[in-house]
Design a protein with these regions (language model features):
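Jelly-roll (double-stranded beta-helix
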Residues: 1-252
Length: 252
């Protein structure tokens, strides 16, 4: 049974363009400091905030599925597959299936925030595939009410957002103060959770705003709010069933 909480101060950090964009990183790149190394089929996770309008220049990717989830404001995306800029706003999401290779650039408006999460879909399969891109709008994601809790399904059965990476489900929870939301976990699943707003307790362990939680070998996760809160959930397999790039890096 394992519940691990990492406050923002205990996460890795980074910046672009002289601090115009700042990041905290629950899962950093292998050469960076972060409290967690890649696990499951999660390779990288950063929470980026734009302090000014700023552009991250064109840069390449291969193999990974790189997802951006817009939390606030507006971002714009350009890549060598689309050859055009596309806007994304709060609640929207995108995936770059980088396959055999693609280059992209991002613009973030002042005050915007997003998660960028890299999933490992088994690079031995995807490095030979053509690259592709999809974006999805907030209104495309189904929502359900669980009592007073609103659950938005971003990735999983019933959502149009698809990944080659197996076994991934992504949810966005809006929870009023004093409520408890229960999530059942299969023995082969892990739950990665980020407190976007507010403050919660995961199985009675406190997690403030911007905290990251990793929960494994827990048959049930109870998320209890201390104040009105928004929480981002990723469910993924504890063992993906293939050799991940992160595992290879850790053996070096």
């Amino acid at each position: 049974v394992s519940v691990r909480i990492f406050s923002k101060e205990k996460q890795g950090s980074g910046a672009f363009n002289g601090g115009e964009i700042v990041e905290n990183k629950p899962i950093g790149f292998p050469q960076e400091y972060s409290p967690l190394r890649p696990y499951s089929n999660l390779f990288y996770w950063a929470h980026a905030r734009a302090l000014k309008d700023s552009t991250i220049g064109l840069h390449p990717h291969r193999g990974f599925e790189i997802c951006s989830f817009v939390l606030a404001g507006e971002i714009r995306h350009y890549d060598t597959h689309l050859n055009e800029w596309r806007p994304l706003r709060a609640g929207d999401a995108q995936v770059i299936r980088s396959g055999s290779g693609i280059s992209h650039s991002e613009w973030m408006a002042q005050g915007s925030e997003m998660f960028q999460i890299w999933f490992d879909p088994d690079l031995s399969r995807t490095l030979g595939k053509p690259a592709g891109y999809d974006d999805y709008r907030l209104e495309q994601f189904p929502t359900q009410a669980h009592g007073r809790v609103t659950v938005r399904l971003i990735i999983g059965p019933g959502s149009p957002f698809w990944l080659d990476t197996p076994g991934v489900q992504v949810y966005y929870l809006q929870i009023p103060a004093g409520e408890t939301h229960r999530t059942e976990l299969l023995p082969e699943q892990v739950l990665s959770a980020y407190v976007v707003k507010g403050a919660v307790m995961f199985n009675r362990q406190a997690a403030p705003s911007s905290a990251f939680a990793l929960l494994a070998e827990e048959p049930r996760v109870e998320t209890t709010t201390i104040e009105p809160s928004e929480v981002f959930f990723v469910l993924s397999p504890s063992e993906p069933g293939y050799a991940t790039y992160g595992q290879g890096r850790m053996r070096v």
